[in-house]
From Swiss-Prot:
Enzyme Commission number: 1.3.1.98
Reported function: Cell wall formation.
Top-rank lineage group of the source organism: Bacteria
Source species of the chain: Streptococcus pyogenes serotype M28 (strain MGAS6180)
Protein name: UDP-N-acetylenolpyruvoylglucosamine reductase
Keywords of the record: Cell cycle, Cell division, Cell shape, Cell wall biogenesis/degradation, Cytoplasm, FAD, Flavoprotein, NADP, Oxidoreductase, Peptidoglycan synthesis
Length: 295
């Protein structure tokens, strides 16, 4: 119990596999769930004062946490999840569920967020990764974000300063943490928006192994190629290391089929990269983030 942070939901030596989409990950020294920006600032100020490392996990969807876990503070934004509308501008806190946020936009007949209707994760993670699917991405609708700097300062970043690229944003280099973001949507027709979201979700269910734990799309799309196609051509569908295998349904996904570990994921990723490069000459680059310590 950290007396200086009394009243904040903080759990010691908490296994992170209970919170990640992959269902792998060792313990966090301290796992914190701030309810508001004040509690978040208190956690960061305490960690900085005590020279303890801290990081934000978001919804831990496109992420692998190593089996040794994470030292210091891990902060999850599950309770920072408010969504507000001001005209055609939607503002969401970083912990807001991305899929649920697209449903709110649909309910108010606002178009622009349809592409994200099936992407797991949080608003903060989506901005960090410039998440996208089916021709759309966060940068297309992004206006600005409030971020928390490593020193504990809160500032606003514009779309220009975010310097979005393919699965990239400037905060991947700066280390700033999104605490909320604003998006510019447009008036639309509820039925049209609903039909498009149903179509995209149907495609996702047909093509992606949603019935298994996974980290989503493992690799970035190499120029002129599709990662899943290259992996399939290298005869890697169904290849398994430990409890993790390349999905038979979509080779761009790796699924935790039975008691997989983070090491299984890392070993399989390395094997796929090497095998695909030997087969096609194309070196795949992981899209998934891998963090934490090995056992």
């Amino acid at each position: 119990m950290i007396t200086e942070l009394h009243g904040i939901d903080i759990r010691e030596n908490e296994p992170l596999k209970h919170y990640t989409y992959t269902k792998v990950g060792g313990p966090a020294d301290f796992l914190a769930f701030p309810r508001n920006h004040y509690e978040l600032s208190r956690i960061v100020a305490y960690a900085n004062k005590e020279n303890m490392p801290w990081l934000v996990l978001g919804n831990a969807s496109n992420l692998i946490v190593r089996d040794g876990g994470i030292r210091g503070f891990v902060i999850m934004f599950d309770k920072l999840n408010a969504v507000h509308l001001n005209g055609y501008t939607l503002e969401a806190e970083a912990g807001a569920n991305l899929i649920e946020t697209t449903k709110i936009a649909k309910f108010h007949s606002l178009t622009g967020f349809e592409f994200a209707c099936g992407i797991p994760g949080s608003i903060g993670g989506a901005v960090f990764m410039n998440a996208g699917a089916y021709g759309g991405e966060i940068s297309h609708i992004f206006l600005s974000a409030k971020v928390l700097t490593s020193s504990g300062e809160i500032k606003t970043i514009s779309a220009r300063d975010m310097a979005f690229g393919y699965r990239h944003s400037a905060i991947q280099e700066t280390g700033d943490i999104v605490i909320s973001a604003k998006f510019a949507l447009k008036p639309g027709n509820y039925d049209t928006i609903s039909q498009e979201m149903n179509r995209l979700n149907h495609l996702r269910q047909l093509k992606q192994p949603l019935e298994f734990p996974s980290c989503g799309s493992v690799f970035k799309r190499p120029p002129g190629h599709f990662a899943g196609q290259l992996i399939m051509e290298a005869n890697l569908k169904g290849h398994r290391i430990g409890g993790v295998e390349v999905s038979e349904k979509h080779a761009g996904f790796m699924i935790n089929v039975v008691d997989g570990t983070a090491k299984d994921y890392e070993d399989l990723i390395a094997y796929v990269i090497e095998t695909v490069e030997n087969h096609s000459g194309v070196r795949l680059e992981p899209e998934v983030r891998i963090i934490g310590e090995n056992l």
